[in-house]
From Swiss-Prot:
The active site is at 411 (nucleophile). This is Uncharacterized RNA methyltransferase SA1713. It comes from Staphylococcus aureus (strain N315). [4Fe-4S] cluster binds at residues 74, 80, 83, 162. The keyword Transferase applies. Its EC number is 2.1.1.-. InterPro entries: MeTrfase_TrmA_AS (IPR030390), MeTrfase_TrmA_CS (IPR030391), NA-bd_OB-fold (IPR012340), SAM-dependent_MTases_sf (IPR029063), U5_MeTrfase_fam (IPR010280). Keywords: 4Fe-4S, Iron, Iron-sulfur, Metal-binding, Methyltransferase, S-adenosyl-L-methionine, Transferase.
Amino acid sequence: MQAIAKNDIKTGTVVDLTHEGHGVVKIDRFPIFIPQALINEQIEYKIIKVKKNFAIGKLLNINTRSENRVAPPCIYYERCGGCQLQHLSYEAQLEMKKEQVINLFQRKAHFDNSKINDTVGMTDPWRYRNKSQIPVGKNEQNEVIMGFYRQRSHDIIDMESCLIQDSQHQEVMNEVKSILKDLNVSIYQEQLKKGLMRHLVVRTGYHTDEMMIIFVTNGKKWPQKNAVVEKILDAFPNVTSIKQNINDSHSNVIMGRQSITLYGKDTIIDQLTDSTFKISDQSFYQINSEQTEKLYNKAIEYAQLTGNEVVLDTYCGIGTIGLYMAPHAKHVYGVEVVPSSIEDAQQNATINQCNNTTFVCGKAEEVILQWKAQGIKPDVVMVDPPRKGCDETFIQTLLTLEPKRIVYISCNPATQQRDALLLAEKYQLEEVTPVDMFPQTTHVETVALFNLK
């Protein structure tokens, strides 16, 4: 193999894209990963890091450009870590995400008879985020900065706009930055673990335009609190809720456990098709409301509900998917380990007049065995776990339950593939549909249908 050393300047042809969106050039089968390089491009690059099994390169010149390369519209794209694919046409982004799923399920796990559908995309893949989490800091000149982190770091890129956030959020961000400066609010400095203001979080109802503004502070005491609220109301008189969240943990976790309502309601309202949901500052709620409706509609299609089925909604959160399915089912049973989420789910069931739902707090693998002992036999089980996927104990419990169908929504297809191999003992993976919940990024959500063999 050719010698490869740091600072070498080389040329080559990009033959693949990684799941992180990096171009791959190979030298005698040894891979070099190069951010922002695209398949079929002939490039010049510099080796910046060499490991035992791979190297990292920096793109210097593109000698032959891909037909899928586009000019990134965001002026911060080269520095900000929020997006990874703005230089790739949207049609090619959707195809790349489908290829990721094919690679996981067919090439690696050999689900050769399972259908992988085209990625469900957006008509306008911008301004889709209904929640923004914006770190606050200071630059070397001791000025207040707000924006998003540089890739793989906690260095804040100061910015005035973000093309994937709701446009209202950037208006709030810029106004808050001005208010913090004017009132000389203490700013948290992560390295020193000192200061007050840590994050600004903004949530909006996609269909209702209700807005919640949350200030995350390092401690409860905040001398300028009332003045900040007054200035926010002057600038945004229609704001629904203003809250203070206290996080003094000095960790990477953005929000703490305690929240105080400073103005307005404790929650905001949003709608998904015909269902209404109360959303608190801590609620898990899908970031992209438009794509969530498409995702849930595909899940209902896979569930094949006629009105006579008993549905178990595991990892149910605030009840969004379960309540979405309730009008089409005989009864929906939801289970979630977070107590506040179950309280929200129960309230949401009342708001939507869903009398055919039951929501219980506990570990899914334990609660569903209790339901089984009570004679509750599900026809369909909904699974929507966090990125780490399902606990193996839960999978084994599910196998003993033997529902006719399992509909599995995942924000991490790699762990979904792992779980699919365990479910294969009794279930046939019929098909997987990727849904583009996060355009311009490498993330892809999937929904899969498993039928009992």
